[in-house]
């Protein structure tokens, strides 16, 4: 992970390369989760008959007229307790209440009731089982309804922590276990564990083709220069070291194609690491809408076939998490069985959703 992503953590942890994905935002601004106080203004006689938006632009010069118009349209500006249109004329003596609305990126700091599946909780840390479809922290296109917003709602004091205590993430459509710090010392400790690569993160993935019995994919990952929305194997200096260890637990034959169930152990935590690594080996994940190439130079193309059950996301689940508890110093671990959608697909493939990990 980039140093910029952890610049708001204590100095001892700023060299961590495994805390947040490379494009993570700094979500530790002070005042996170605080309510916005309304602004009350009275229209002077000199502005009698003026349009509401123009009058407010003169009385509240810190805000642009376009932003004020947006607030009026949103019903956040009231005259005498009633919402009005921007073109409405004001009268001298009118009492105007303006409730400033946060810009999209500011919603990153708003507490919202988001359903979090809590697997474990104490005064030091929290472990959640994130469902597919839930975004971890706000970013373009997903400014609200994230894990971070839910943390601020559940724990108001999390507003004082960098990123509300988040130290690592899962992709939106990846399900499974995440650990979140509840104190700054715990967050610092967890970042150091990630830096030392002692946090054990185990995933289950369904991939196309027959994978080797076991192996390690050691290939650097960086932003794809041909498509900046993708990550890719980058052999130049801009690629960051990435290692994924895997074991094949099961292989099924669909007639025209094969599907492998693999257990993955992350040594590093690059953006989209498992998805990129297995695509690079010619074994893209089932359901992955982005990393879909099914061939590797010098190897035959992996054949794909219709699945026996519909599946609308990448088949990836963070099934096991292990670390040293920041307060007790004891080794602890958690397990989260595969969610219903993945279990149904595995049943249809005649694989055991309760497969034993190795």
Curated annotation (Swiss-Prot):
Record keywords: Cytoplasm, Isomerase, RNA-binding, rRNA processing
Q: Check the record and name the PROSITE patterns matching this protein.
A: PSI_RLU, S4
List the catalysed reactions: uridine(1911/1915/1917) in 23S rRNA = pseudouridine(1911/1915/1917) in 23S rRNA
Q: Which residues, if any, are the signal sequence?
A: none
Q: Where is the active site?
A: 171
Q: Does the keyword Signal apply?
A: no
Enzyme Commission (EC) number: 5.4.99.23
Gene3D superfamilies per the record?
A: Pseudouridine synthase, RNA-binding S4 domain
BP GO terms, sorted: enzyme-directed rRNA pseudouridine synthesis
The S4 RNA-binding domain covers 50-114
Where in the cell? Cytoplasm
The Gene Ontology terms for molecular function here are: 23S rRNA pseudouridine(1911/1915/1917) synthase activity; RNA binding
Give the domain of life.
Answer: Bacteria
Q: Which InterPro entries match?
A: PsdUridine_synth_cat_dom_sf (IPR020103), PsdUridine_synth_RluA-like_CS (IPR006224), PsdUridine_synth_RluC/D (IPR006225), PsdUridine_synth_RsuA/RluA (IPR006145), RluA_PseudoU_synthase (IPR050188), S4_RNA-bd (IPR002942), S4_RNA-bd_sf (IPR036986)
One of the record's GO cellular component terms: cytoplasm
Similarity comment: Belongs to the pseudouridine synthase RluA family.
Q: What does the UniProt function comment say about this protein?
A: Responsible for synthesis of pseudouridine from uracil at positions 1911, 1915 and 1917 in 23S ribosomal RNA.
Q: What is this protein called?
A: Ribosomal large subunit pseudouridine synthase D
Q: Which gene encodes it?
A: rluD
